[in-house]
Amino acid sequence: MPESRARQRLAEEAARIILEEGVRDYGLAKRKAADHLGMSGRREMPANTEVEAAVLERNRLFAGAENRREYLDRLRVAAVVMERLAGLEPRLVGPLVIGILEPQPLINLHGFAETVEEVIFQLGDMGIQCRSGERHYRGGQGARAPFLSFRGPEGLDIELTVFPADGIRQAPPSPIDGRPMRRLGLPAVQELIAEAEADLAPSD
């Protein structure tokens, strides 16, 4: 099989695994794809950007109306949570930003505060119980950042990674291509909602 075709098949299978099995680690998805296709001995794997392109293409081809409605619902919940946490200047990150609906009912946000403790107190004042953890990023500022997970509206899980107040100026590197992660403020999320609503509107 030509090298280019082998890379394409691996990227496509990794994309299927990401979308259907909810695997978030692109490296793991590629290794599983290689095992599924009998290519586990390969040294050359498709780049993460190739896999992401395959994810977007598969989503474009196979996302039905039900999937698009669920995507819209998840964006609406994200907007509600962002409005409630406006003091943290929250930003939406992750697959929803590029139009991808994960199997897990999860919304990823970045928030900004002097300390994570003040965020925990704020959530407590709102009657929200949360669990804490730590997220690791590749190098640079914010290589480690605490995150809080809690249940949001409609039973969706929220993961809020808390950065220092000045961390809003520099996004951490994306695990896909190493560039600064895309972050969307509430106005941009509302634009996505409007686009998703238009996509679902019946045509004349």
Where do the model's predicted regions map?
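Catalytic core of pol beta-like nucleotidyltransferases
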Residues: 4-23, 30-103, 114-204
